Amino acid sequence: MPPTRDPFQQPTLDNDDSYLGELRASKKLPYKNPTHLAQQQEPWSRLNSTPTITSMRRDAYYFDPEIPKDDLDFRLAALYNHHTGTFKNKSEILLNQKTTQDTYRTKIQFPGEFLTPPTPPITFLANIRHWINPKKESIHSIQGSIVSPHTAATNGGYSRKKDGGFFST
């Protein structure tokens, strides 16, 4: 069999180089320097070492005194101030304001807001009765337990009850 014959006879796909029938030489020149040396030369080193405005604003040390101090800034600073809350050690990170101070269930009153008085506890709204069983039940007793749709009647595990949840009587 001649080496030029294709035994599968599938059409060959054309691309930019072989569409006209002749192969073009590659216009891309090989790099002169390796990558680690080229990164130390211009313009790559200048572009890499000069921060953009966006990347400067993302920096933890960035502070702009011209930012207006409006209501939104006040609310954001009340939740988290990244100028004072960064670069803390592990023991300071684990401390939380809610756990170190008695601020549980307190709400910050912003300018122009009026806080509503807290609602009284449920015990004042309803007469709650507490009952204690005089006879201690056994923890192994199934009387009064929560009914399950499965039963432990089989040896290898649990199976479904006959009527899907309760035994028929």
Swiss-Prot record:
Residues 36-45 have a biased composition (Polar residues). InterPro entries: CFAP276. Residues 160-169 have a biased composition (Basic and acidic residues). The keyword Ubl conjugation does not apply. Changing I122N: Found in patients with a form of Charcot-Marie-Tooth disease leading to demyelinating form; likely pathogenic; does not affect subcellular location; increased protein expression; increased aggregation in vesicles; increased intracellular Ca(2+); decreased mitochondrial Ca(2+). Changing K28I: Found in patients with an intermediate form of Charcot-Marie-Tooth disease; does not affect subcellular location; reduced protein expression; increased intracellular Ca(2+). Microtubule inner protein component of sperm flagellar doublet microtubules. It is linked to CFAP276 mutations may be the cause of Charcot-Marie-Tooth disease, a disorder of the peripheral nervous system, characterized by progressive weakness and atrophy, initially of the peroneal muscles and later of the distal muscles of the arms. Charcot-Marie-Tooth disease is classified in two main groups on the basis of electrophysiologic properties and histopathology: primary peripheral demyelinating neuropathies (designated CMT1 when they are dominantly inherited) and primary peripheral axonal neuropathies (CMT2). Microtubule inner protein (MIP) part of the dynein-decorated doublet microtubules (DMTs) in cilia axoneme, which is required for motile cilia beating. May play an important role for the maintenance of myelin-axon integrity. May affect intracellular Ca(2+) homeostasis. This is Cilia- and flagella-associated protein 276. It comes from Homo sapiens.
